[in-house]
Design a protein with these regions (language model features):
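Conserved two-lobed SF2 helicase motor
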Residues: 109-127
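SF2 helicase catalytic motif II
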Residues: 121-124, 129-166
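Hydrophobic residues on the short alpha-helix immediately C-terminal to a glycine-rich phosphate/catalytic loop
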Residues: 22, 41-49, 71, 153
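Walker A/P-loop
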Residues: 25-45
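Pre-Walker A (Motif I) flank of P-loop NTPase domains
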Residues: 24-30, 55-57, 114-115
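Conserved Walker A/P-loop ATP-binding site and its immediately adjacent core
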Residues: 39-44, 54-77
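Conserved pre-motif I regulatory segment
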Residues: 1-31
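Conserved helix-turn-beta segment of the N-terminal RecA-like "Helicase ATP-binding" lobe
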Residues: 66-100
């Protein structure tokens, strides 16, 4: 995996503390004020995970399509040489689907690649139905994760993903 040195941000103490906790706990809440660098915590953690000799699949969940696309752009400023999928109904130049079978197929043709999947809370159940093995999942604006329609998929990934983190302000 190539990790871009461009736009490398010096992490602040609270971000380093969050990353240290993420290294030792498989499940947790990361509470950082708006503008405090939650996205950079996710990106830095993903970079660490992608250094593993075994390929990893990381899912990033956002409340809106626009934010999912924005997070994708931010991640890809710092992480390259990964397979990227979007699971939502919005437009993107990456592979995109809302069909669980298509996502399963995409996953199967990228067995040796690190993978980033960007989705919304509305479409998270599509990833659950695809049976893609998720190593790490980041829930952005995590207060959305407990809404009645979203909770079953949230609960599934909090129990079944190797690592699960809820980011909120």
């Amino acid at each position: 995996m190539n990790i871009s040195n461009e736009n490398t941000m010096q992490l602040r103490p609270h971000q380093l503390e969050a990353l240290d906790k993420m290294n030792t706990k498989r499940l947790g809440q990361i509470i950082v004020p708006t503008g405090g660098g939650k996205t950079m915590c996710m990106i830095e953690d993903a970079k660490r995970q992608f250094k593993s000799p075994v390929s990893k699949t990381i899912v990033v969940v956002a409340p809106r399509i626009l934010l999912a696309n924005q997070l994708s752009s931010e991640f890809l400023e710092h992480i390259t040489n990964v397979a990227v999928a979007h699971v939502h109904s919005g437009e993107t130049h990456h592979f995109s689907t809302t069909n669980s079978i298509d996502l399963t197929h995409w996953d199967s043709i990228n067995p040796h690649h690190n993978k980033l999947i960007f989705t919304t809370y509305h479409s998270l159940h599509k990833i659950q139905n695809s049976m893609v093995d998720v190593d790490t999942i980041y829930f952005d604006e995590a207060h959305n994760s407990v809404q009645k329609n979203f909770y079953p998929a949230t609960e599934h990934f909090s129990r079944n993903a190797d690592r699960c983190y809820f980011f909120t302000a």
